[in-house]
């Protein structure tokens, strides 16, 4: 157990950040999964809407510092490639 006051404070803030990060990452997985399911089902409209929703979630995660901007760009690129292949 930490003895120094600042260490005790960091333990609390790190735990809060960990919980928030896990929640945001879970939302990201759900959003990306929705895009993939729509693509597999062949539903163009739903896939497009889910793509916009997932892109927004990814951008928000970057702004919160949960994931790196390059990782968000890679994920957005991958799902948009699937959706555009469905439309094309």
UniProtKB/Swiss-Prot annotation:
Disulfide bond sites: none
UniProt-listed Pfam families: Ribosomal_S20p
Keyword terms: Ribonucleoprotein, Ribosomal protein, RNA-binding, rRNA-binding
Coiled-coil residues: none
Biological processes annotated in GO: translation
UniProt cross-references to InterPro entries, sorted A to Z: Ribosomal_bS20, Ribosomal_bS20_sf
MF term (GO), any: small ribosomal subunit rRNA binding
One GO cellular component term noted in the UniProt record for this chain: small ribosomal subunit
Family under the similarity heading: Belongs to the bacterial ribosomal protein bS20 family.
Job of this protein: Binds directly to 16S ribosomal RNA.
Name of the featured protein: Small ribosomal subunit protein bS20
